[in-house]
UniProtKB/Swiss-Prot annotation:
Top-level taxon in the UniProt lineage: Eukaryota
Entries under Pfam families matching the protein: Apolipoprotein
Keywords, sorted A to Z: Chylomicron, Endosome, Extracellular matrix, Glycoprotein, HDL, Heparin-binding, Lipid transport, Lipid-binding, Oxidation, Phosphoprotein, Repeat, Secreted, Signal, Transport, VLDL
Entry's localization field: Secreted; Secreted, Extracellular space; Secreted, Extracellular space, Extracellular matrix; Extracellular vesicle
Assigned GO CC terms: chylomicron; extracellular exosome; high-density lipoprotein particle; low-density lipoprotein particle; multivesicular body, internal vesicle; very-low-density lipoprotein particle
UniProt cross-references to PANTHER family, sorted A to Z: APOLIPOPROTEIN, APOLIPOPROTEIN E
Sequence repeat ranges per the UniProt record: 75-96, 97-118, 119-140, 141-162, 163-184, 185-206, 207-224, 225-246
Region Lipid-binding and lipoprotein association, annotated ranges: 205-281
UniProt-recorded name of the protein: Apolipoprotein E
Signal sequence extent: 1-18
PTM annotation: APOE exists as multiple glycosylated and sialylated glycoforms within cells and in plasma. The extent of glycosylation and sialylation are tissue and context specific.
Amino acid sequence: MKFLWAALVVTLLAGCRADVEEEVKLGQEPDRWQAKQPWEQALGRFWEYLRWVQTLSNKVKEELLNSQVTEELKLLIEETMKEVKAYKEELEKQVGPIAQETQARLSKELQAAQARLESDMEDVRTRLAQYRSEAQAALGQNTDDLQGRLASHLRKLRKRLLRDAEDLQKRLAVYQAGTREAAERGVSAVHERLGPLMMEGPLQAIPPSQQLRERAEAWGQKVRGRLESVGSQARDRLDDMRDQMEELKAKVEEQASQVRLQAEAFQTRLKSWFEPLVQDMQRQWASLVEKVQSTLGISPSTKPSKTK
């Protein structure tokens, strides 16, 4: 049984670290988190969705003005936390109770790690909402600076999220190890009591690791289906938002063209107003000059004679 539980731990944790390190490289296409626990699959889907938003062009990033993106992230956060809780409860059912003091300590540490991870995911969603507000305030202006700050914040939040996700993995492993040791101690006591009977005939039992693995796979398929549905709906909504942004851009360009034409027409009108006035002033000035010259006895065409 100890060997089976050791194999289970290796199966649960294998590949997790490698995939976490791959996540740091934004350009790599992530796997579908099939080798992980349901809560890790949900977390992976959360970041895959966010990464997909980051890869959009600057023009399309303005789609974040719609609050639907943050609502989809909220749904993924709730799904992740739900699967973490379900996984912890499943561990408790499979391996049985442990010492009350140990269980209280491990549960407290696990809840703290879970809260940190949830806080990191909420910070990501909050930062996107803040960007949406700032972008609305700067509508029609250059948003390169806002997008740069958003990318910088998301990189920092990503590092913190991955760090706390790894910490939660370790806490779950410790919790599982503690419950497994308690179960093994109970099995050892039963083995000592039933030793003579076991000599007469071997006991047959279904390995608990098999049941846990099957349930984990079932959860994975169920959650994967939900998240794929959510992702598909989100992409459809973003496509609609992209079309709306294109329509808005066309309207803005049309209005700008109309304003430009109106300005040109107004300029022409002003010119038609003031041109006769200027011409009239020029005529009056020429007339005044002639009168002054006439009064002084100066002919406009007469040149002063040279003194011999």
